[in-house]
Swiss-Prot record:
Gene source species: Enterobacteria phage T4 (Bacteriophage T4)
Function: Capsid decoration protein that binds as a monomer at the center of each major capsid protein hexamer once maturation and expension of the capsid has occured. It only has a marginal effect on head stability. Dispensable for the head morphogenesis and phage infection.
Region (Interaction with the major capsid protein): 355-359
The family this protein is said to belong to: Belongs to the Tevenvirinae Hoc family.
InterPro entries membership: HOC, Ig-like_dom, Ig-like_dom_sf, Ig-like_fold, PKD/Chitinase_dom, PKD_dom, PKD_dom_sf
Keyword Hydrolase: no
Keyword annotations of the record: Capsid protein, Virion
Subcellular location: Virion
Description of how the protein assembles with itself and partners: Monomer. Interacts with the major capsid protein; one hoc molecule associates with each hexamer facet.
Disulfide bonds: none
Coarse class of the protein's main subcellular location: virion
Any single GO CC term annotated in Swiss-Prot or TrEMBL for this entry: viral capsid, decoration
Protein name: Highly immunogenic outer capsid protein
Length: 376
C-alpha cells in the first residue's frame, strides 16, 4: 500500500490574525516507523513537526497554500515520504470605526457668519487614514475633504450637517462611515437702523412752507425703506421721506414718522421718530416810512382813519385771490396803509375806517372778511 497523507480542513477561509488549525492524517505507512511532519505556508517552512499545525493568518489578504510533508522513518531501510496541500482564503478584518460630528447641538448661527464643525473617528485601527466628505442638506460641499469644516450659511432655516469618512487601514476592509446628523438653525442677520428728522422741530408762522425730512442711517446698502406719517397720532398721507406740514391753523402738532427697513438676509426693522410743530399767527412785516395817523375815539372804544378807496380795492382783490391782506404782498405800494389798518385792528376793540369813494364807514367785521364793497 502506498504511503499517503491528507490535510483537514479542506479549502477553509479565515480572517487575518485568526488562528486556524490543520491536521495531517497519514495512511498506508509501513508499520513500526516514526512519522514526523514538516509544515510550510507558501513554501515558507513553519515551526513544529506534529500532525497538527496552528497557523495565525497573516496579511495581505488572498489565498495561501498550506503544505505538509510526512516522513515515516523506519528502523530498516530508507524513510517513506508523502505530502499534501490545501488552500486557505485569508480575508481582511472588518472595521468597527465610528464617526461623530461636534458640536452635536450647535448654537443658532447667522447668515454670513462661519460655523465650525469637527469630525472625529473612534475605534479605528492603528495607523488608519481617512478622507472626508461634508454634506449640507444631503448635498455634498465641494472642496471640503478635511476633518474640520467651516460652514458659512447663505440662507436662513434649519440646516442638516453630516460627514462621511472613507477609512482605510492595513489588513482591514475599507469602510465608509457616516456621522451623526447635526441640525443648525440659521437666523437672518440683525440690523440696527436709526431714523432722524430734519429739522428736529419746526416753529413757523401760519401758512408758511415747512417740511420734515426723514433720514435713515445704519441700514444695509441694499435696504428698501418705506415711510408712513402720523399727525397727532392719526395717519396722514405720505409715503416718502419728505412730509409737508399743514400750517394753515395756529397751534401745535406732533408729527411721527415710521420707517420700515427691509433687506435680503436681514430681519425687518421698524423705527419711529417724532417732531414737534408750533404754528404761530402771522406777523406782518413792518414797512418803511411813517404810518398814517390814527385818531383814537376813547369814548367809543374805537379809532378813526380816512383811507383811500384804492387801498380798499386792493384788500378786496387780495381776499378774492385767497391772500391775507394783512400780511401778504409786503412789496405792494399800498402795503404801508394795509399795515396801518391791521395794526389799528389789533390796537382797538373797534375801528371806524372811512373809505374815500363813497364815504362809507367800514368797521372791523368787514375788514376781517376782506369784503369791502360786495358783501357775501
Amino acid at each position: 500500500m502506498t504511503f499517503t497523507v491528507d490535510i483537514t480542513p479542506k479549502t477553509p477561509t479565515g480572517v487575518i490574525d485568526e488562528t486556524k488549525q490543520f491536521t495531517a492524517t497519514p495512511s498506508g505507512q509501513t508499520g513500526g516507523g516514526t512519522i514526523t511532519y514538516a509544515w510550510s505556508v507558501d513554501n515558507v517552512p513553519q515551526d513544529g513537526a506534529e500532525a497538527t499545525f496552528s497557523y495565525v493568518l497573516k496579511g495581505p489578504a488572498g489565498q495561501k497554500t498550506i503544505k505538509v510533508v510526512a516522513t515515516n522513518t523506519l528502523s530498516e531501510g530508507g524513510p517513506e515520504t508523502a505530502e499534501a496541500t490545501t488552500t486557505i482564503t485569508v480575508k481582511n478584518k472588518t472595521q468597527t470605526t465610528t464617526l461623530a460630528v461636534t458640536p452635536a447641538s450647535p448654537a443658532a448661527g447667522v447668515i454670513g457668519t462661519p460655523v465650525q464643525f469637527t469630525a472625529a473617528l473612534a475605534s479605528q485601527p492603528d495607523g488608519a487614514s481617512a478622507t472626508y466628505q461634508w454634506y449640507v442638506d444631503d448635498s455634498q460641499v465641494g472642496g471640503e475633504t478635511n476633518s474640520t469644516f467651516s460652514y458659512t450659511p447663505t440662507t436662513s432655516g434649519v440646516k442638516r450637517i453630516k460627514c462621511v469618512a472613507q477609512v482605510t487601514a492595513t489588513d482591514y476592509d475599507a469602510l465608509s462611515v457616516t456621522s451623526n446628523e447635526v441640525s443648525l438653525t440659521v437666523n437672518k442677520k440683525t440690523m440696527n437702523p436709526q431714523v432722524t428728522l430734519t429739522p428736529p422741530s419746526i416753529n413757523v408762522q401760519q401758512d408758511a412752507s415747512a417740511t420734515f425730512t426723514a433720514n435713515v442711517t445704519g441700514a444695509p446698502e441694499e435696504a428698501q425703506i418705506t415711510y408712513s406719517w402720523k399727525k397727532d397720532s392719526s395717519p396722514v398721507e405720505g409715503s416718502t421721506n419728505v412730509y409737508t406740514v399743514d400750517t394753515s391753523s395756529v397751534g401745535s402738532q406732533t408729527i411721527e414718522v415710521t420707517a420700515t427697513v427691509t433687506a435680503a438676509d436681514y430681519n425687518p426693522v421698524t423705527v419711529t421718530k417724532t417732531g414737534n410743530v408750533t404754528v404761530t399767527a402771522k406777523v406782518a412785516p413792518e414797512p418803511e416810512g411813517e404810518l398814517p395817523y390814527v385818531h383814537p375815539l376813547p369814548h367809543r372804544s374805537s379809532a378813526y382813519i380816512w383811507c383811500g378807496w384804492w387801498v380798499m380795492d386792493e384788500i378786496q382783490k387780495m381776499t378774492e385771490e385767497g391772500k391775507d391782506w394783512k400780511t401778504d404782498d409786503p412789496d405792494s405800494k399800498y402795503y404801508l396803509h394795509r399795515y396801518t389798518l391791521q395794526k389799528m385792528m389789533k390796537d382797538y376793540p373797534e375801528v371806524d375806517v372811512q373809505e374815500s369813494r363813497n364815504g362809507y364807514i367800514i368797521h372791523k367785521t368787514a375788514l376781517e372778511t376782506g369784503i369791502i364793497y360786495t358783501y357775501p
